[in-house]
UniProtKB/Swiss-Prot annotation:
Biological processes per GO annotation: dimethylallyl diphosphate biosynthetic process; isopentenyl diphosphate biosynthetic process, methylerythritol 4-phosphate pathway; terpenoid biosynthetic process
Manner of cofactor binding, per the entry note: Binds 1 [4Fe-4S] cluster per subunit.
Reactions listed under catalytic activity: isopentenyl diphosphate + 2 oxidized [2Fe-2S]-[ferredoxin] + H2O = (2E)-4-hydroxy-3-methylbut-2-enyl diphosphate + 2 reduced [2Fe-2S]-[ferredoxin] + 2 H(+); dimethylallyl diphosphate + 2 oxidized [2Fe-2S]-[ferredoxin] + H2O = (2E)-4-hydroxy-3-methylbut-2-enyl diphosphate + 2 reduced [2Fe-2S]-[ferredoxin] + 2 H(+)
EC number(s) per entry: 1.17.7.4
Cofactor: [4Fe-4S] cluster
CDD domains hit by this protein: lytB_ispH
Name of the molecule in the record: 4-hydroxy-3-methylbut-2-enyl diphosphate reductase
Gene it is expressed from: ispH
HAMAP family for the chain: IspH (MF_00191)
Residues reported to bind isopentenyl diphosphate: 43, 81, 131, 227, 229, 272
Membership in a protein family: Belongs to the IspH family.
Gene3D superfamilies: 3.40.50.11270, 4-hydroxy-3-methylbut-2-enyl diphosphate reductase, catalytic domain (3.40.1010.20)
Species name: Symbiobacterium thermophilum (strain DSM 24528 / JCM 14929 / IAM 14863 / T)
Nuclease in keyword set: no
Length: 295
């Protein structure tokens, strides 16, 4: 099987920084115990399992403020997705030792929102509902940041004539979908200022898939199902490159039926996918003998 290794792929700088920070904290005997992560440090179960092996406890499943109430003492780590100011304030009130692993790109978006709202803007924020990154961003200025996921959500919004408006977004969305939605916002409210915050790593990975996937018969994206950026890579392969594409968490999830009749398979991975997981997928495919397997 010929494998096209799409590059860039895998870890982005924000994920690398977050993982390295947790490792350092876990190995530091001076850091108060127990050590908690408020949500998954990044959306990948393999990374979460590594953190748990280091003695770090992952709290997941609710909004960040609710999760925080489960912690009475010790250390709390904020994930790469960022948290709202209310979460930071509550952590200090509880006397917790705080470690902030927020991606610098997310921090920049929070600062942008705060600055815009301080100047009298209402902010339309394009993001995935239920994802922790929009939760933190909307929490920067509750009541002034309006979360929309699709065009239909715009129908519920109304602003006073002359209201200053800005639109920005979650960093890991499809850049094409985001641009299309921003154009719809601009068409409805022409005074809207546009601030596209798709991070460079997301852009580069999506553009690489759009460029290289057409050379393949099949695209496999290695990533966690909760990883928004991984899911967007599948979307790009299917919608822009018009290729069959599948998301797998590990090599064990590859269905041989996908490979039947295929000669070239392109492989990429999400920004939170460990390198060794992707390497195992590539090695499996390179050794896969289509003729033998199809007999």
């Amino acid at each position: 099987m010929e494998v096209i290794k799409i590059t860039p792929r895998g870890y982005c700088h924000g994920v690398v920084g977050a993982i390295q920070l947790v490792r350092r904290v876990a190995r530091d005997p001076n850091v108060p115990r127990p050590i908690y992560v408020l949500g998954q440090i990044v959306h990948n179960r393999h990374v979460v399992e590594e953190m748990e092996a280091l003695g770090v406890i992952t709290l997941d499943g609710e909004d960040r403020l609710s999760l925080l109430e489960k912690i009475d003492a010790g250390t709390v780590i904020f994930t790469a997705h960022g948290v709202s100011p209310a979460v930071k304030i509550r952590a200090r009130e509880k006397g917790l030792y705080v470690v902030d692993a927020t991606c610098p790109d997310v921090t920049r978006t929070h600062e942008l929102i705060a600055e815009l709202v301080s100047r009298g803007y209402e902010v339309i924020y394009i993001g995935k509902k239920g994802h922790p990154e929009p939760e933190g961003a909307v929490g920067v200025a509750p009541g002034h940041v309006h979360l929309v996921e699709r065009a239909e959500d715009l129908e519920a919004l109304s602003f006073a004539p002359g209201q200053k408006l800005a639109v920005t977004n979650q960093t890991t969305l499809s850049q094409w979908d985001t641009q299309a939605l921003m154009e719809q916002v601009k068409a409805r409210w022409p005074q809207t200022e546009i601030y596209n915050e798709i991070c460079l790593a997301t852009q580069q990975r999506q553009e690489a898939v759009a460029r290289m996937a057409p050379e393949a018969d099949l695209v496999i994206v290695v990533g966690d199902r909760r990883s928004n950026n991984s899911n967007r890579l599948v979307q790009v392969a299917q919608e822009l490159a018009a290729r069959e594409a599948h998301l797998v968490d590990s090599v064990e999830e590859i269905d041989p039926a996908w490979l039947k009749g295929k000669r070239k398979v392109a492989v990429t991975s999400g920004a939170s996918t460990p390198t060794h997981i992707t390497r195992a997928v590539i090695e499996f495919l390179e050794k896969y003998n289509v003729e033998v397997e199809e007999r």
